[in-house]
Amino acid sequence: WYGLEIDKRPLKYALKNKLFRDLWDQEIIDILNSILINGFFRDKQIKCDLLWGDARSKIAQIPEDINFDLIFLDGFSPQKCPEIWTVEFLEKVKKKLKPQGSFITYSSAAAVRKTLLDLNLKIFNIKPNKDLAKYWSNGTLAIQNYNKSKCEDNPHIENLSIMQIEHLSTKSSIPYRDPNGNDPSEEIIKRRKQEQSFSE
């Protein structure tokens, strides 16, 4: 597998914490140490690379011939970390999916969902757990080249509700844009607010 991560501190702090280390076999700790120090781990069964740095540029370091059955994007919310929710970055992510590959995220933001739809991905709502019934969504699943006959029924996902579909026609669905691929979050948010102000 490949991972993209900008901040080494959580893993560094975890590996220094005895309570964390005691949760895992030494083999797992060795893998995590290698990832932290070297950015990769290899043995006969496991091959993993973690590319430390800005995901917008690091994604290009994944070899062109490698695509994924599943991509999980576990970033902060678009308002806090818009860099990884832009049209430009999500388009790069889509290109790394295999045919009928899946993209999954905790985000259910209208701007994210509208961008995924505009990238010709079929999107589904991830149902909240029973103990989180007060929430209307637990995230978004997007599938490339969706073929219902080849996809098993999944009790954890559902089509978007009428309310969710209507939400994609509001100003909230205006996407985040980063045409230069390296703009700071403040600039990306400012650009979107300007676009929203001109939207009817």
Place the predicted regions along the sequence by residue.
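Conserved SAM-binding motif I beta-strand of class I
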Residues: 1-5
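A short glycine-rich, Lys/Arg-flanked "PGG" loop and its adjoining helix->strand segment in the class I
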Residues: 83-99
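Conserved SAM/SAH-binding beta-strand->alpha-helix loop
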Residues: 7, 109
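Conserved beta-strand signature within the Rossmann-like core of class I S-adenosyl-L-methionine
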Residues: 70-72, 99-107
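A short acidic, Gly/Pro-enriched loop at the edge of an enzyme's catalytic core
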Residues: 60-70
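SAM/dcSAM-binding transferase cores
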Residues: 42-43, 138-200
